[in-house]
Curated annotation (Swiss-Prot):
Record-level GO BP terms: formaldehyde catabolic process; methanol metabolic process
Function: Oxidizes long-chain aliphatic alcohols, long-chain hydroxylated fatty acids and S-hydroxymethylglutathione (hmGSH) in increasing order of preference. Shows little or no activity with short-chain aliphatic alcohols.
Location(s), subcellular: Cytoplasm
Signal peptide boundaries: none
PROSITE patterns: ADH_ZINC
Binding site for Zn(2+) 2: C92, C95, C98, C106
Catalytic activity annotation: a primary alcohol + NAD(+) = an aldehyde + NADH + H(+); a secondary alcohol + NAD(+) = a ketone + NADH + H(+); S-(hydroxymethyl)glutathione + NADP(+) = S-formylglutathione + NADPH + H(+); S-(hydroxymethyl)glutathione + NAD(+) = S-formylglutathione + NADH + H(+)
Domain of life: Bacteria
Subunit relationships: Homodimer.
Single GO cellular component term: cytosol
Native species: Cereibacter sphaeroides (strain ATCC 17023 / DSM 158 / JCM 6121 / CCUG 31486 / LMG 2827 / NBRC 12203 / NCIMB 8253 / ATH 2.4.1.)
EC number: 1.1.1.1, 1.1.1.-, 1.1.1.284
Binding site for Zn(2+) 1: C40, H62, C170
Protein name: Alcohol dehydrogenase class-3
Length: 376
């Protein structure tokens, strides 16, 4: 069949809207009609050419929601008509990682997914002249129709709006999950969130959901103060407006008459800046503070700290897709949204057509959007 898609023909160039060929699902695969897709910084990272693993031509996009229209042989967990969210982190429930119950990083299709291919080593997309087009993060949601492995779709309730729940495919889950699954924040905790973009705001609402008592947001942009407060932030710090070291400032903020050591129980880096990652660790409480690294640093970047920071009880942890097991946890997060436990609507700042998709990247570069969503 043919489908409309925004194709990344080469790095550094705007996406091109065109008709492409899409082959139907093979064994263990499903075809999904994408109804809405978010535009994420990871898509921009690859399109810019900065991603060392970026390959072209490809159909980007990994934050979508849609309806199953066809299933291949052997598919049992979804059927045509089911509403689903594509998963760039699948859940096969059979590989050593899934069976360990210690990680969400399923390895079942990791090798081929990283090459922009389906599990059988081929692509379902091609140009009208037959030139293969690569998949992206196993999803390719910048196409009106896409094909995914069965293990890479989460079935969700049919009454949830596509243009909101698509954000659960990446940003919402990454932020809230880092709090709930990775850090396991408890009621009454003190936390600091570095970087108040879409991920940071979702960390903040995850902290509020978990019952954190003090939620400090750190950002160089004062406009983010109002955004943070909307989602549950209790204090705001702009590092450029304080005297002295931001770590010392944060430690002092978290001191109490009972605890004069100070430091946060949990910190979260949502910036991808390795200097900020160090500050986040060192703003943790001596003896038990945990710093969760969410932001993706540039290729080749390294983190540094003095070993004394770790010897005295601080912990560095990483979190990918919020530690969420996609097929199991994503439907629950959709339920949280539908039950009013978390907010998504305010973060969807722009709704665009496929023809306007490049405007979404422009808005991101200008810092004018939290999340732009393309609706098909």
């Amino acid at each position: 069949m043919r489908t409309r898609a925004a194709v990344a023909v080469e790095a550094g160039k705007p996406l091109e809207i065109m008709e492409v060929n899409l082959e139907g699902p093979k064994a263990g695969e499903v075809m999904v009609e994408i109804k809405a897709t978010g535009i994420c910084h990871t898509d921009e990272f690859t399109l810019s050419g900065a991603d060392p693993e970026g390959m072209f031509p490809a159909i980007l996009g990994h934050e979508g929601a849609g309806v199953v229209v066809e299933v291949g042989p052997g598919v049992t967990s979804v059927k045509p008509g089911d509403h689903v969210i594509p998963l760039y982190t699948p859940e096969c429930r059979q590989c050593p990682s899934c069976l360990s119950q210690k990680t969400n990083l399923c390895t079942a299709i990791r090798g081929t997914q990283g090459q922009g291919l389906m599990p059988d080593g081929t692509s379902r997309f091609s140009m009208l002249d037959g030139t293969p087009i690569l998949h992206y993060m196993g999803c390719s949601t910048f196409s009106n129709y896409t094909v995914l492995p069965e293990i890479a779709v989460a079935k969700v309730r049919p009454d949830a709006p596509f243009d909101k729940i698509c954000y659960i495919g990446c940003g919402v889950t990454t932020g809230i999950g880092a709090v709930i699954n990775t850090a396991k924040v408890e009621i009454g905790a003190k936390a600091v969130v570095f970087g108040l973009g879409g991920i940071g705001l979702n960390v903040i609402q995850g902290l509020k959901l978990a019952g954190a008592d003090m939620i400090i947001g750190v950002d160089l942009n004062n406009a983010k103060k109002e955004w943070g407060e909307r989602f549950g932030m209790t204090h705001f710090v702009n590092p450029s407006e304080i005297d002295g070291d931001v770590v010392a400032h944060l430690v002092n903020m978290t001191k109490t008459p009972f605890d004069q050591i100070g430091g946060a129980d949990y910190t979260f880096d949502c910036t991808g800046n390795v200097k900020v990652m160090r500050q986040a660790l060192e703003a943790c409480h001596r003896g038990w503070g945990q710093s969760i690294v969410i932001g993706v640093a540039p290729a080749g970047a390294e983190i540094q700290t003095r070993p004394f920071q770790l010897v005295t009880g601080r912990v560095w942890k990483g979190s990918a897709f919020g530690g969420a097991r996609g097929r199991t946890d994503v439907p629950k997060i959709v339920d949280w949204y539908m039950e009013g436990k978390i907010q998504i609507d305010p973060m969807i700042t722009h709704i665009l057509s496929l023809e306007e998709i490049n405007k979404g990247f422009d808005l991101m570069h200008a810092g004018e959007s939290i999340r732009s969503v393309v609706v098909f």
